[in-house]
């Protein structure tokens, strides 16, 4: 599929706002879009969906096999999409410790031209050195346009354009400084899209700014250029947790990867959704229940009082139904959760651990997992860990994974499993290797 990537020299350059504005502007022009977020981030994809009206897939070149990324790209083409719009993560060449898994790697894999968003707030002629360095750093990654962001005045814009003119990299537009074009944040990143009361107005405003200040015809020329190679379409996927999987989905359980659901459906699984915050129970015929990550620490009191949800999960576990929790879902499977104010809330009590958001410590990074039983995955896995909550008490139980970091350093064992119930702080993304 033809498309392009919005990337930047560093985080905080404005690429998310630019991506959202372009998605909405292209949607208004009638383009059929395939939004993509590079890396493991859960929050930006919900904004992409709001802007485009289409589900956004995470494509992670560190955690996913190249074949899976190519297959997911092909799947988007099969669904009728015509333009893939990818938002990079961090800086264009930033990845794991060795630099692998960067946005540049994804652009190379999918043959996407890169549009570089540069924060110009505190520079003028120095931008030429920055853009030149980025354009020359990897010859297999093509930077085919620049968007100047946070430009202070027409004079500032003229200086920037003059500095870049000798490089031959097209300047697609210059966006003025505008504090209104920023999104609210919290501890794991942006506030979730569903909680942004003025999101629709923000997206329309961002699209108006893109239409007014970016040469959309020049951008189209970039994404319509001939591709150098085609992606492969078929690849093995992670086995589903069951045949009929009930997935918790609401503001407390919002962090789930679309590619997992798509892959499970392709392998014949049925997926249904329920809201613990609305005190809903999973479907009675579900043979697997998935509690993904999210923000249970912000909704602990409501979860503690959700009697129908609590009873249904407990009954399902007693019947031997697979119950699997990741990160926030893992915390909810434990005995208690201490919120930021130090209040302890009873959780499901299906795993012998107590967690705290009051005693915060950042845990962040890619992980290599060796399953130790309890799940349908018996091959090495790649995952991501990102949370502030800590385990304050943990009783003896079987472990779920043996863990290494991205550089291969042994981090010991993690997660718990009791009967058919299991969980950990790891967000599983893909398996490692080519055999399912």
Curated annotation (Swiss-Prot):
PROSITE patterns: GATASE_COBBQ. The active site is at residue 327. Pathway: Cofactor biosynthesis; adenosylcobalamin biosynthesis; cob(II)yrinate a,c-diamide from precorrin-2 (aerobic route): step 9/10. GO terms for molecular function: ATP binding; cobyrinic acid a,c-diamide synthase activity; hydrogenobyrinic acid a,c-diamide synthase (glutamine-hydrolysing) activity. It catalyses: hydrogenobyrinate + 2 L-glutamine + 2 ATP + 2 H2O = hydrogenobyrinate a,c-diamide + 2 L-glutamate + 2 ADP + 2 phosphate + 2 H(+). Keywords: ATP-binding, Cobalamin biosynthesis, Glutamine amidotransferase, Ligase, Magnesium, Nucleotide-binding. Its EC number is 6.3.5.9. The keyword Membrane does not apply. Its cofactor is Mg(2+). InterPro entries: CbiA/CobB_synth, Class_I_gatase-like, CobQ/CobB/MinD/ParA_Nub-bd_dom, GATase_3, P-loop_NTPase. It is an enzyme of class 6 (ligase). Coiled coil: none annotated. Residues 244-435 form the GATase cobBQ-type domain. GO terms for biological process: cobalamin biosynthetic process. The record marks 427 as: Increases nucleophilicity of active site Cys. Disulfide bonds: none annotated. Catalyzes the ATP-dependent amidation of the two carboxylate groups at positions a and c of hydrogenobyrinate, using either L-glutamine or ammonia as the nitrogen source. Belongs to the CobB/CbiA family. Comprises of two domains. The C-terminal domain contains the binding site for glutamine and catalyzes the hydrolysis of this substrate to glutamate and ammonia. The N-terminal domain is anticipated to bind ATP and hydrogenobyrinate and catalyzes the ultimate synthesis of the diamide product. The ammonia produced via the glutaminase domain is probably translocated to the adjacent domain via a molecular tunnel, where it reacts with an activated intermediate. The a and c carboxylates of hydrogenobyrinate are activated for nucleophilic attack via formation of a phosphorylated intermediate by ATP. CobB catalyzes first the amidation of the c-carboxylate, and then that of the a-carboxylate. This is Hydrogenobyrinate a,c-diamide synthase. It comes from Brucella suis biovar 1 (strain 1330).
